[in-house]
Amino acid sequence: MYVSTCKGGATGQYTYVRLMESYRDENGKVKHKVVQNLGRLDILSQSDPNYLENLKKKYQEDYAEKNRLQSLNRLAQVQNLLSFDNNSSAGAPLPLLQYGHYLLKKIWDDHLHLDRKFKDIQHRQTKAKFDLNAVVSYLCFLKILDPHSVFYSFGDQDGFLGAPVQGIGLDSYYNSYDYLFEHKDSIMKFFNRSINNQLGKTKATLIFYDVTHVYFETALTDLECGRQQMDFQDRLQEEVQLAYESGELDAACFDKEGRLVPGQKTDDFIKKIQAQKIEYLRMRGPSKEHRFDLPLTSIALVINEEGIPIDFYVYAGNASEFKTMAASIESLKQKYNVKESIVVADRGLNSAANLKMLQSNDLGFLMAQKVSNLDQKTTKAMFDPEGYVPIIRQGEEVARFKVVKDWTKKGKRKAEDTKCTLVLTFDKKRQKRDLAVLEVWKQLVLKKQAQGIKVKPKSSGWASIAKTSEKTEARIEGIDEETFEAKRRLAGYAALVYKNAPNCQDNDAVPDGRLAAAYHELNQIESCFRIMKSHLGLRPMYVRNSNHIKGHILICVIALGILKLLQWKLNKSGTPLTISEIIRALNSATTVPIKSGDELMFLQCSRPQNIRKGLERLSQEELKAELAKRRKQPNQLEILFKTVGLVPPARLVNLKEMGRCLGVRLTTEEAIPELVKDML
């Protein structure tokens, strides 16, 4: 019990004293109840001016005595454990169970309320006979803790405290991907509302957009396998209906059964559908990871300023990034009523047509611009040192920028021309890097020349500085000195284009200095892709039908959102951790269950991992002293517990205490996976 006060009276003029008690309901949630109302503080203090302080001290002493008795009881339990029969399980080792997923479950249930969403989907809109929320949350948590295929994840379920997916068959795991695909839009909408509630925002000011490709470890594309997207026929029927209603197709284009018949209009319609690339998903195409030999899928990701996903879109591996951007933005606007925001994107998506498209959707833009494509007048202004504003950090100039107002981005057609603000930047570190890359390219070209390698004209990368005498593919003759010197002169320079949303009230929504700094934020979405690929198992994919592919991507996107939200909370509380540190700390949450008579005890343990990081140059004595000092501070796992609103368990706890720390009600029957119980 503990002492609490509350206001009362007609105008809240009185303070009342009461005894309170904490308890857990049937769902394991912490609740509070009034044990006794002691009365008004002003009356109680008449006989003892320090009444409230003395009362609190009394119950604190009672609490301390309770803790002392618990410690004595714990000591007796440890002594009992040390004397257990060593031959009870024929010398087999005790199982090691993970419980880091309970911290993720806390975010899933209490911060984002995703358990409610999936229970609602199952209750109202699916025929699932299994616990959909249990399977989806388990797959999502495992993407963070130890990403693998669905098949491997199913086999790994017995290594987790609380048996999160006990009794659910493998087929249900794959079926959950079908439900994820079917309800993707409603799930992402709910996810966004929950995220905005956590961040205290109503809409994103800056929206980051980029595209990546993921590969499949299979030799054949969907076209070569004859495997259409699962929803292709439905999408085709929708396109036919729209074409008929708009007059693109007329009655003469159909036979009596409603099938398309050959003809000019029909042929044009089929070509349009083929250009949309909606029939096949896994196709060969451009790959930033140079996996041109494998089928790919294209993923367009939209994130907010905190790096938390807003939505994603999946396209065929051979679809054009330029063409799919319009479809993604249109869908984003319809689903989330996004307007007056600024879309931030890399230069690979910067075209006059896309900029015009964004403006027509009442969106602004902030995109990287190739400095090699600037006109002669603008290039001259870029090299002119006059007008540049220095960017100072820690008393030292690290970069400088210049703003060119009313600059025109030229399109293929006059109608696509867009007036905007051009921001030119120069960075000494970037100059050093660019020059180093050019030298590497130069040596590579000379090496390729000696090998008799052929290149095509207007190639990118190292081949762009290779000299040839033919207009087609030809042998390298040396270094194209003119191109090489032009690239050397551009080293260190970069640019971006900016324009606010057409209907935005504040025409100077982003100050010039903020524009220059925003250039560095373009890497944020690339970081999200790296996290999903390196830490969350986005690729390679081990599913093949289009619905399961999109379900898998949704799982990875939600996992990214959970990690980014957790990282945001850590930064806000002044205890920042990297994504790698968060994952490593979660995986260190391991416990050994031990039977002590009829009671189940849990001994916390973990394997030391890379504890020398950052201390490699210290002597053994210095290292021991530094680690001893660090152990007096909360470790990373303890920080995570505090951030999500849980309490880390002591080194040795019983079943009830373990459940209390993890915010759940653990029972003897459910705490240990069924197949592991015989190991105790």
Summary of predicted features, one role per range:
Residues 258, 265-266, 294-297, 314, ...:
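An anionic, glycine-rich sequence signature occurring as long contiguous blocks
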Residues 26, 160-167, 200, 305-308, ...:
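Secondary-structure transition/capping motifs at alpha-helix termini
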Residues 313-335:
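Active-site beta-loop-alpha junctions of metal-dependent nucleic acid enzymes
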Residues 19, 153, 208-211, 307, ...:
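Conserved structural-core and active-site-/substrate-pathway-adjacent residues in large, well-folded domains
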Residues 514-542:
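Short amphipathic alpha-helical "interface-anchor" segments enriched in bulky aromatics
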Residues 39, 545-566:
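Basic, amphipathic alpha-helical segments enriched in Lys/Arg and hydrophobic/aromatic residues
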